[in-house]
């Protein structure tokens, strides 16, 4: 019984922390004239708290695992909502596919070139150094 109670409190604490970050993000969007959704700001707040180790990751891990486990179920209402526009989607299928393909290609190129640019002068540890005498 004690393990069940302890697990229940861990889930409750995780969901309260996640909800508080969501609420804080929504409050920031109401107070400031920015066009970023409150849920995104809430995730950024949660990320900042976790990455700065102000908030231990073990506190939110049970709730996150539960949400990730049932993530597919959480997307069902969105899929049903998209099906209301099935006629419009079929009419615009070609442009949608082309824009998805082109945007994916552009993102891959930009990420590839920018990563090469950022890491161009970085020396790899353990690799032999070449001097003029070796050539």
Swiss-Prot record:
Transmembrane segments: 4-24, 30-50, 63-83, 93-113
Membrane topology: Multi-pass membrane protein
A cellular component annotation (GO) from this entry: plasma membrane
Subcellular location: Cell inner membrane
Keywords of this entry: Cell inner membrane, Cell membrane, Membrane, Transmembrane, Transmembrane helix
Similarity section: Belongs to the UPF0299 family.
Name of the protein: UPF0299 membrane protein YE2790
Organism placement in taxonomy: Bacteria, Pseudomonadati, Pseudomonadota, Gammaproteobacteria, Enterobacterales
């Amino acid at each position: 019984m004690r393990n069940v109670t302890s697990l229940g409190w861990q889930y409750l604490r995780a969901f309260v922390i996640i909800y508080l970050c969501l609420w804080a993000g929504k409050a920031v969007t109401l107070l400031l004239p920015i066009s970023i959704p409150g849920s995104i700001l809430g995730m950024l707040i949660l990320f900042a708290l976790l990455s700065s180790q102000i908030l231990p990751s073990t506190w939110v891990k049970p709730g996150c695992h539960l949400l990730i486990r049932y993530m597919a179920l959480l997307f069902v209402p969105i899929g049903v909502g998209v099906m209301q526009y099935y006629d419009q989607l079929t009419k615009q299928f070609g442009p949608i596919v082309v824009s998805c393909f082109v945007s994916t290609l552009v993102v891959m190129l930009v990420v590839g070139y920018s990563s090469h640019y950022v890491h161009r002068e970085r020396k790899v540890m353990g690799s032999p150094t070449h001097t003029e005498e070796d050539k």
